[in-house]
Amino acid sequence: MHIQNAVKTASKRLHYLTVMARHGLPPEDLVSIYTTLIRPCLEYSSVLMVGCNKKQQAELERVQRRACKIITRRAGNISQPLPSLQSRREEAAVKLVRDMHDQEHPLHDLLPPTRGSRTGRTLRNQHRLADPEPKAKTNRLKNSTLHTAVRLYNEL
């Protein structure tokens, strides 16, 4: 439900981008309008959406593609292409797991121990979590935020 509301809100805000493009704003300004006005709607609580299904990912990416079409319609090409929303969500999830390694982090207890702390020895892969993929009996749990974030962190 949250993703549908985010897509709906961002789609409504695309109108502002269209109006600004019609008035001849340069593409750099249109990109900054997109990143300050529209993308926050799509990325609100994005760490929690890292495990969303393919259909929901496509809905979110569709809004960004529409914004890129509006921006590039006037200029032809953007000097720096916008990163996909999925890659930004994955980066945020990995950052969350890194932050959770801190003993003072409120969610620290949810992480499994690292391989180095479990064995007590210096290992090449000691930064990885001991369980490469947390055990999950259902796909819903397997695609949940924490499980997906741990899986992405271990893939680094």
Tell what function each PLM region has.
Residues 1-156:
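Hydrophobic/basic alpha-helical segments
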